[in-house]
From Swiss-Prot:
Coiled coil start-end: none
Pfam families reported for this sequence: E6 (PF00518)
Gene: E6
Keywords, in A-Z order: Activator, DNA-binding, Early protein, Host cytoplasm, Host nucleus, Host-virus interaction, Inhibition of host innate immune response by virus, Metal-binding, Modulation of host cell apoptosis by virus, Transcription, Transcription regulation, Viral immunoevasion, Zinc, Zinc-finger
GO cellular component, one term: host cell nucleus
Protein name according to UniProt: Protein E6
Main location: host cell
Subunit structure: Forms homodimers. Interacts with ubiquitin-protein ligase UBE3A/E6-AP; this interaction stimulates UBE3A ubiquitin activity. Interacts with host BAK1.
Family: Belongs to the papillomaviridae E6 protein family.
Localization, UniProt: Host cytoplasm; Host nucleus
Amino acid sequence: MDLQSFSRGNPFSGLACVWCREPLTEVDAFRCMIKDFHVVYRDGVKFGACTTCLENCLDKERRLWKGVPVTGEEAQLLHGKSLDRLCIRCCYCGGKLTKNEKQRHVLYNEPFCKTRSNIIRGRCYDCCRHGSRSNYP
C-alpha cells in the first residue's frame, strides 16, 4: 500500500507547515495523521507541521524548559487521570505514546518529564530503541 491511498482521507494532505510555511510532503502529512496531530488554523488557513520544524520546536522546548522527572504515579496525581487516559507525547518526535510505551516507562523506571505548563513528555519506542536519544531530561 502506498502513501497516496492514505492521502485521500488525510486532513493534512495539501497543507503547509505552520512554522516554515512550506508545503507538507506526503510523508510529513502522513506522520501528522498517524501522530494524531490537530489541524491548526491561523487567520482561517489550515496548517500542519513538517518533521524538521516539529523536531526543532521540541528541541527548543527541551532546552528552554528544563524538565522535572516524574514517575507515572506522580503524573497521574498531577492530572487526576489514569496513565492510560493521559495524553503523553514523545519529547523527540511529538508522537502520542501508546499504552505499552507508557507501561515501558513504568516497568523500566524511566521517568516521564514534566515541562512547561505541567505538560508530561516521554519517549516512544522509535526514539528510544537504538539509544541515540537519551532519557529526558
